[in-house]
Amino acid sequence: MKIFVLLLSLLSLQAFPQVFRYDIDKIPANLKKNANAVIRESVLKVDIRSENEMVYFIKTAITLLNRTAISEYPFIVYYDKSSIVKNIMIHLYDKNGKQVGKVPASEIHDQSAVDGFSLFTDNRYKWYTPSYNDLPYTMEYDYEIRCKNTLLIPSFIPVEEPGLSVEQSRYELTAVKEFPIRYRAYNSTGKRSDSADAKRNYVTWSISNIPSFSISNYELPEEYIQPKVRIAPVSFVYEGYKGNFTTWQEYGVWTYKNLLEGRDKLPEETATLMQKLTAQVNSKEEKVKIIYNYVQKKTRYVSIQKGIGGLRPMTATEVDQLGYGDCKALSNYTMALLKSVNIPSFYTEIYGDRSGRDFAEDFPSLQGNHIILAVPLEKDTMWLECTNDKSPAGYLGTFTDNRKALLCYANGAKIVRTKVYHKEANIKNTLVNCSLDTFGNLTGLVNRTFEGIFFNEQLGMESLSEQKKKENILGDFTCNQPLIVYYSINVSKEKIPRVEEKINFKSTSFAGLKKDLMIVPLSLIGPTMEAPDNVVKETDPFYIRHGFTKKISYEILVPKNYTLENIPTPVSTILKTGMIQQNYKFADGKLMVDFTLMLNEGVFPAAEYKDLILLYKSLEQFKRIKLIFQKVVKSGN
């Protein structure tokens, strides 16, 4: 009998007892609100058995409330040659919590993370998307991963995506005493319990009832609002290489020695070619541009899906021969080419996304998902995005600009901030010269320039077909059915990168006619601004990631014998969040309008959100303005 009881106890440690019936009526109403799916139960057990053995046990039950959830939250797990996925079990439950299916192994797909490139065939993922259509329903899955590497310990992130709420989530960490761990909690991570026995330390975090969040304009980045526990080792093993990770300095030394050292060797003929290409140039910056341009023309970027690809780049020789690589490989290759002409550069780990996520400087741990290159100049640092074959040297787009990243070198590493584009650099200028005929038809020329973050937004236009270019341009016009007669684009990749556009257009019946009146709308082409929620915030601060300056000038020649009846009053609204200015002038049959919208970057207190709303409303009011011109009838006619 004692043996039987002991056996049951041991089994209970490995099994996940079903403590929930997945009846959707049991989901609290606040968790269904604005949610596509609800995590009913999530358990992640991480068992670190030695410095080179770690096992995860994962169980998740997720109720899919609508069709969006089916595509957004499939079962997916990544693995590589250093990890093994085992014991996958997937069950489906109907809206009442009754089991309606067990997914056979044959329906769980297994494929390469990057198809068509044999170099990456060890990087794979397993996935399954339910074909059950009777929404809502619940998918429950269990699996385990056995891993030889202990550098990256999973973080506890109860809810990672917008539209997802959490009923209950738990993280159980077990580590042998010989493997001490570090952790740092952010943004209210629920309850924590600690315990230990003679051989192991145990930490458990649990949290419940987390409503879904949405990403709206001007919200703080997710890292400032999401519950999260970062977990990192004191010492670790990665692909057989031991290292310490209590400081950034230690990690930098390990990275250089084990991931980079010796992988920058080039074929002799390639090194000689670099020296020839740069022989007539004295400026270090110009030499960097020449080599960066060479990389852009010679190589192409191969994307490896997140979580896959390892940390070590391909060798520079492999990239030179094959002509492709991921961010690690292309950055390492560019670094090797620069080294061949005696220009030092530094491999830089960064988290690439549109929100500008910083490295947490106070908690050394593996935090990046992308690699770029830093080239120190005499007065500045030149940043190279080696995966982009169109951007000029030194330009970073919104995916990597203005955030803390980790610059690695032979003797260590340090946290640095990447290039910042302030409102004075983010400029979009629009100049419209046009004329109206007596039938209200408008013919004109638009000249637009884009700098700073706007440069990257418009750069892709250059490679589009003529038809696609016109379609995109039409989307910028707000007037009635414009006809694009001619379009040209010029991309300048000099010190201040700039896109210049010229657009010849016609708009039939642009102005309204009523007896002797001509009614002219000012809504023609921009400017725009992301809309804030039309609700004044009470407590939460808000965030403007990129400030900018947008200017638009209209010069409209009206038919002879028309005079302006209702010239608007000039406007100058200056607030902490930004500024709007409007000026109007009518002389010699020509209407001149100047409009400037400036938005300031930064984090602002909730009390100033009403000012942001005011700026937006002022912009919308400007675009609704209609000017009335009166035809002057000469006496005696």
Annotate each language-model stretch with its function:
Residues 1-21:
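Bacterial Sec-dependent N-terminal signal peptides
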Residues 18-637:
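A sensor for short, sequence-defined functional sites
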